[in-house]
């Protein structure tokens, strides 16, 4: 092979620190670093706040952090699905509040069993998602407009459901236990063992299938790295939680939504259709994908997860009131998805984005409170982090377009 036959991409590499920096910038522009920037950012946030307040990484505070992010993190998982389509849902905040209020009213005022009241709250979310999804797909009204209208309408519905009192206290143990249950040490270690075992079995199964099909699979070192990360993460998390009150049920519910959504998007035909529609809707339609159905189902899933987040929030504060679903819930839910690595332009991201982004936002808010910073500083810092994440996303998209991979 002559010099002119060398791949031009290889010719750009330079030895030394300067070459490594240029290669890092190239990979960042083309979106090849995955979740690494988010993880490094999270580590930096934790190091800073731990140095500012030694209680930040204590088991008690980390348990509180998980409880704080479980609600809007669950909402953010649904937001990830909508963003994967290249759409937006501005109504998820008040959908969560309305679902929590519906559950509280039915349980407290109408004496519904807690389980059925929870199911009704989830059904309200699913129904709203179906309505908004059909409005977007059948009437061709942009999702921004439809869900902005929903933002206003569901806020009004929340006030109507609560009535003149404006607040309903929740005392049923089935509901309050959602955020108040902590599992024993034995249960925690069992869950960690299950997580590690399933990861190992998944890696072995995938490698065997690749070998049987004669395909070149993922390098062994990457699979080993995945197993190590999951193992260390599970062991450390359980050890931290067990040092306090135990593994929180609310955190498991949030993680459950992440895992189920990750399986849906990566392991099912419907999940591949979501990425296809988000990448190029017209190409997906010509390939035979029922684009409108995919969009409608995603809006239903997003609103249902918003309802679940609202129910968790009501369980944590032991009430549903006029501020439920308001404040910074919507912005935190969207920001978590974007900061975690989900593209605003559609077609790129994962359910794990919600977890990573929620940890970043929750850590900033929690750390600011510990060091006594006021809300104004907290919001400005969170806004700066969101702007940085959106900028990286835009730069990465331009890099992929330039390289013909978008």
Question: What does each model-identified segment do?
Answer:
Residues 114, 143, 166, 173, ...:
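Loop-to-transmembrane alpha-helix initiation sites
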């Amino acid at each position: 092979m002559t010099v002119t036959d060398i791949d031009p991409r290889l010719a750009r590499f330079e030895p030394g620190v300067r070459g490594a920096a240029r290669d890092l910038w190239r990979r960042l522009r083309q979106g090849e670093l995955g979740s690494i920037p988010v993880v490094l950012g999270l580590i930096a946030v934790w190091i800073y706040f731990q140095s500012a307040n030694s209680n930040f990484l204590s088991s008690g505070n980390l348990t509180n952090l998980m409880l704080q992010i479980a609600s809007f993190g669950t909402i953010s998982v649904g937001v990830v699905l909508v963003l994967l389509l290249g759409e937006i849902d501005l109504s998820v905040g008040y959908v969560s509040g309305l679902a929590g209020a519906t559950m509280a009213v039915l349980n407290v005022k109408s004496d519904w069993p807690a389980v059925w009241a929870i199911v009704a709250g989830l059904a309200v979310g699913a129904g709203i998602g179906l309505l908004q999804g059909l409005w977007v797909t059948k009437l061709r009204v942009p999702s921004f407009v439809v869900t902005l209208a929903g933002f206003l309408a569901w806020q009004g519905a929340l006030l109507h459901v609560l009535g003149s009192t404006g607040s309903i206290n929740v005392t049923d143990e089935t509901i309050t236990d959602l955020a108040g249950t902590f599992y024993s040490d034995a249960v925690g270690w069992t869950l960690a063992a299950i997580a590690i075992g399933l990861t190992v079995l998944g890696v072995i199964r995938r490698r065997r299938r690749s070998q049987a099909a004669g395909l070149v699979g993922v390098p062994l070192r990457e699979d080993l790295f995945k197993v190590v990360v999951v193992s260390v993460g599970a062991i450390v998390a359980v050890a931290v939680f067990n040092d306090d009150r135990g593994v929180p049920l609310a955190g498991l519910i949030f993680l459950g939504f992440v895992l189920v959504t990750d399986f849906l998007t990566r392991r099912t035909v419907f999940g591949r259709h979501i990425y296809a529609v988000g990448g190029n809707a017209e190409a997906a339609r010509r390939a035979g994908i029922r684009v409108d159905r995919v969009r409608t189902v995603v809006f239903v899933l997003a609103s249902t997860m918003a309802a679940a987040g609202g129910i968790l929030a009501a369980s944590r504060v032991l009430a549903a009131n006029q501020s439920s679903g308001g404040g910074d819930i919507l912005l935190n839910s969207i920001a978590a998805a974007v900061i975690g690595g989900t593209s605003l332009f559609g077609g790129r991201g994962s359910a794990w984005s919600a977890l990573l982004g929620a940890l970043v936002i929750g850590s900033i808010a929690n750390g600011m409170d510990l060091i006594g910073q006021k809300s104004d500083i907290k919001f400005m810092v969170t806004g700066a982090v969101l702007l940085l994440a959106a900028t990286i996303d835009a730069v990465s998209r331009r890099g992929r377009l330039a390289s013909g991979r978008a």
